[in-house]
């Protein structure tokens, strides 16, 4: 299969703003792809060489080295390449223009590159894999030579998307949900197969692997798919409510209640003597927690399992729980063993999804928890999450206050009926989080996605000083604008913000972004931030839950303030539009709705 086919589709996808058209075009590409390498094609579409959970190195080519590779491949002076880049701000476009210039001047033949040669997907994939995996002395020069070799063979369009791929900036607007829908259309006979494909992906979060199974064994093979140790399961997510009475009613009157810890959610896999740890974003974080690997090996029983818990920093003297920020300090230390001594951790387990070749995601919570408790040996490091079973509001409140007093964020209330399965990759009412109220009319913070930026005035003139934020709508796989946040940032954070956003800047609005407001720059929906505000109000300026509460208006957060970045969350883990609506419906209503704020000021 020629790489040119993918490049031509990428070129079309880049210009589309409709998700339906995006999905249809992507399905067309998948259906025309070589089935023998369908997994590689899917990874390339995702902008990666392999799934994140494998923990393999990224390509590791910076702008300086890309410029050198383009210079070598196009026989152009490095300064000229750099000046052109400064002028247009897109290295992919720089490569395309310089390759086009080569073609028009006939220099390709002089360089010994035949225009009849075609770049194959296999060659691109294997060469870029070498680039990523090459380490040691002389590795940078080898990476540059390998990349320059590909660019020499590439036509202008191929060169553009090769460079963007290496940069990690494909800019074609494709999310995992779009790929899933496209796979269902291309291989499953239509949109009706989406649920089957999505379930398989939730159990094995590897789109390339799922695509390979479909083309080799058919869509029916996905129906019997089980979790596999080493491939993370997409985590089950909770809804949120701030009223204990309503929570208990929602879960049927009785529930299992766990502490909600202020730590890092972790999915732990074991097979024989191999142990893997994955973050909630499904990244392999095993190397960050050699102490946890040791604890799991020593204090759990079973040859093969997938369990879930929270890694929490604890005080080395008292054993009391520390905050999430303390855990982040540990991650920033270069000497991991020094970090283990300074920031020790405990693991609080709360679920079991797979054990000895049996899929437990389809079994009730009480069955899963009972088995989980049976495989943990008594010890001081790996424990079952603090929990009780409640059937009245008083006990729920009492346990909630106890969790807060001991350093927790609140509690997780979990349904315990026969239908209380593990809903991989889904957010539902089987789990509901109850967190402490903040000193604000909003009962909780929200996690929102950055979709655009606005330049400041005065001393911040010409620099980004505020952000357009969006909530995630899982029904449409889009990000709907909900506020413009300008407060809560330190000067240092604003300077860092400028750099972060310029790296993901887009020429046009991302096809998954739904916004009436026009920021000064559009960006890829990549970064998630925790935001607090005064209240949620009706606004004609924003698209979150548009036409749901009031015609031609959406919901917005009044007086939003930045709290912190949520690097542990993917954009799809952000607060959903339904959650924003739920928070709006639950907050005390004023007799007259507050007028919308002019956010253009």
Swiss-Prot record:
GO terms for molecular function: ATP binding; DNA binding; DNA ligase (ATP) activity; metal ion binding. It catalyses: ATP + (deoxyribonucleotide)n-3'-hydroxyl + 5'-phospho-(deoxyribonucleotide)m = (deoxyribonucleotide)n+m + AMP + diphosphate. The keyword Ribonucleoprotein does not apply. It holds the Pfam family DNA_ligase_A_N. Its EC number is 6.5.1.1. Residues 568-601 are annotated as: Disordered. ATP binds at residues 258, 265, 280, 310, 350, 427, 433. The active site is at 260 (n6-amp-lysine intermediate). One of its GO terms (biological process) is DNA recombination. Keywords: ATP-binding, Cell cycle, Cell division, DNA damage, DNA recombination, DNA repair, DNA replication, Ligase, Magnesium, Metal-binding, Nucleotide-binding. Its cofactor is Mg(2+). CDD domains: Adenylation_DNA_ligase_Arch_LigB (cd07901), OBF_DNA_ligase_I (cd07969). Belongs to the ATP-dependent DNA ligase family. DNA ligase that seals nicks in double-stranded DNA during DNA replication, DNA recombination and DNA repair. This is DNA ligase. It comes from Saccharolobus islandicus (strain L.S.2.15 / Lassen #1).
């Amino acid at each position: 299969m020629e790489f040119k086919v993918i490049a031509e589709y990428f070129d079309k996808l880049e210009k589309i703003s409709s998700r339906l058209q995006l999905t249809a075009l992507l399905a067309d590409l998948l259906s025309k792809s070589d089935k023998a390498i369908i997994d590689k094609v899917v990874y390339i579409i995702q902008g990666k060489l392999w799934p994140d959970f494998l923990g393999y190195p990224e390509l590791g080519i910076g702008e300086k080295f890309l410029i050198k590779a383009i210079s070598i491949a196009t026989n152009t002076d490095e300064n000229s390449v750099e000046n052109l880049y400064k002028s247009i701000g897109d290295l992919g476009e720089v490569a395309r223009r310089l390759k086009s210039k080569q073609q028009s001047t006939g220099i390709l033949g002089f360089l010994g590159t035949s225009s009849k040669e075609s770049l194959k997907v296999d060659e691109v994939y294997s060469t870029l894999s070498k680039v990523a995996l090459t380490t040691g002395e002389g590795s940078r020069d080898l990476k540059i030579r390998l990349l320059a070799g590909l660019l020499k063979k590439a036509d202008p369009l191929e060169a553009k998307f090769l460079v963007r791929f290496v940069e990690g900036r494909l800019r074609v607007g494709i999310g995992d949900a779009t790929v899933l829908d496209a796979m269902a259309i291309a291989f499953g006979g239509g949109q009706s197969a989406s649920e089957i494909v999505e379930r398989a992906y939730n159990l094995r979060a590897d789109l390339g692997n799922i695509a390979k199974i479909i083309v080799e064994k058919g869509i029916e093979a996905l129906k019997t798919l089980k979790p596999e140790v080493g491939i993370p399961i997409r985590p089950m997510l909770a809804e949120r409510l701030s009223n204990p009475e309503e929570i208990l009613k929602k879960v049927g009157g009785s529930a299992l209640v766990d502490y909600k810890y202020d730590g890092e959610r972790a999915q732990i896999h074991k097979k024989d003597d191999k142990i893997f740890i994955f973050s909630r974003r499904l990244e392999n974080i095993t190397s960050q927690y050699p102490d946890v690997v040791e604890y799991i090996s020593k204090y759990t029983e079973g040859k093969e399992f997938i369990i879930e818990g929270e890694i929490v920093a604890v005080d080395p003297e008292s054993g009391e729980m520390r905050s999430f920020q303390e855990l982040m300090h540990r991650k920033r230390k270069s000497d991991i063993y020094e970090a283990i001594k300074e920031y020790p951790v405990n693991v609080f387990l709360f679920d079991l999804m797979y054990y000895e070749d049996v899929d437990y995601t389809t079994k009730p919570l009480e069955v899963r928890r009972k088995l989980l408790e049976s495989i943990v040996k008594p010890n001081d490091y790996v424990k079952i999450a603090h929990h009780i079973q409640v059937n009245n509001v008083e006990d729920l409140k009492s346990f909630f206050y106890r969790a807060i007093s001991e350093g927790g964020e609140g509690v997780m209330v979990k349904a315990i009926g026969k239908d209380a399965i593990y809903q991989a990759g889904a957010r539902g009412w089987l789990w509901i989080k109850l967190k402490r109220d903040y000193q604000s009319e909003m009962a909780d913070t929200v996690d929102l996605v950055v979709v655009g930026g606005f330049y400041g005035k005065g001393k911040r003139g010409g620099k980004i000083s505020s952000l357009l934020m969006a909530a995630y709508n899982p029904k449409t796989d889009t990000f709907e604008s909900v506020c413009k946040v300008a407060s809560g940032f330190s000067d240092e954070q604003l300077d860092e913000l400028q750099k972060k956003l310029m790296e993901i800047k887009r020429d046009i609005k991302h096809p998954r972004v739904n916004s009436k407001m026009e920021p000064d720059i559009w960006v890829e929906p990549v970064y998630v931030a925790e935001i607090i505000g005064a209240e949620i109000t009706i606004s004609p300026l924003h698209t979150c839950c548009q036409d749901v509460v009031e015609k031609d208006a959406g919901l917005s957060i009044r007086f939003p303030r930045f709290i912190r970045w949520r690097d542990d969350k993917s954009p799809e883990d952000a607060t959903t539009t339904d959650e924003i609506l739920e928070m709006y419906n639950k907050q005390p209503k004023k007799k007259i709705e507050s007028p919308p704020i002019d956010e253009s000021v």
